[in-house]
């Protein structure tokens, strides 16, 4: 059976890539996002797709039914469910478009499959309860997940909430119950090392600047042999702590020795910074972050997109591998 898919909050097309990666039969009938920069990247990679630059609340049930889609893939704004977003939940206007979709779901009787992604924390929200209640009301069976890319063999930490749902009249052998699943049944083994995604001869513009080197004590440093990396956020390269890992070609022993020497100097001092400069610490390039997030090698970012824009878009995107595995389960 060939499926017709509506991709909401399409961003740079992570869900589209995941659908292709899954090997399932179907096409993205329409993709919708209000972010013009994200849309330019999407169009660059998927020029044939019907991409709409508009507010999702402008999509009437009649328009969606006219497309005859049977599947909705979506990643609604996550800020209302984060600490930085003050956990405003349904009081945050950024939830309005998703609340609108929840509100019209009972009119979309042509839709049989749904996959939704959001940040960890969504599972405790009022919006989640409204979403789940509506799924039940519309005769969907659902399964919730909290999954990290490391559980599917990817060397990255990016814990996210996922919900897959399908109509109750469709037999679904996977359904596990009401508990949130944190591991998939398939064993993906330990994550591979970062070596395969590291670019050679990287431009010096990716070196960590002196003002950030002053905060080197909080860096999460990765090596070619590392089988892990921290979650890359949209603030990557702007803040030192908690926005993503830093890379060095130097051996661990050299880095360790540098930290030992640096500890004998005042944190942030000139000598402190000089010691860390010797490590040639650099940011992961946008291409490397794309690879860590499992985008295909053929995927690329247009040259007219600034570095800041690249990292912001990547920080808001999804892990392609995790989504593709969930799609296989959803359509099992």
UniProtKB/Swiss-Prot annotation:
GO molecular function terms noted in the UniProt entry: DNA (cytosine-5-)-methyltransferase activity; DNA binding; RNA binding
InterPro entries: C5-MTase, C5_MeTfrase, C5_meth_CS, SAM-dependent_MTases_sf
Catalytic activity: cytidine(38) in tRNA + S-adenosyl-L-methionine = 5-methylcytidine(38) in tRNA + S-adenosyl-L-homocysteine + H(+); a 2'-deoxycytidine in DNA + S-adenosyl-L-methionine = a 5-methyl-2'-deoxycytidine in DNA + S-adenosyl-L-homocysteine + H(+)
Pfam families: DNA_methylase
Compartment(s) of residence: Cytoplasm; Nucleus
A single BP term in Gene Ontology: tRNA processing
The protein's Enzyme Commission number: 2.1.1.204, 2.1.1.37
Record keywords: Cytoplasm, DNA-binding, Methyltransferase, Nucleus, RNA-binding, S-adenosyl-L-methionine, Transferase, tRNA processing
Predominant place of localization: cytoplasm
Binding residues for S-adenosyl-L-homocysteine: 12-14, 33-34, 55-56, 75, 79, 97, 316-317
SAM-dependent MTase C5-type domain ranges (all copies): 3-332
PROSITE patterns: C5_MTASE_2, SAM_MT_C5
UniProt KW Calcium keyword: no
Gene Ontology CC annotation, any one: nucleus
Active site: 78
NCBIfam families, A to Z: dcm
Function field: Specifically methylates cytosine 38 in the anticodon loop of tRNA(Asp). Also has DNA (cytosine-5)-methyltransferase activity. Shows affinity for both tRNA(Asp) and DNA substrates.
Similarity comment text for this entry: Belongs to the class I-like SAM-binding methyltransferase superfamily. C5-methyltransferase family.
Protein name per UniProt: tRNA (cytosine(38)-C(5))-methyltransferase
Species name: Spodoptera frugiperda
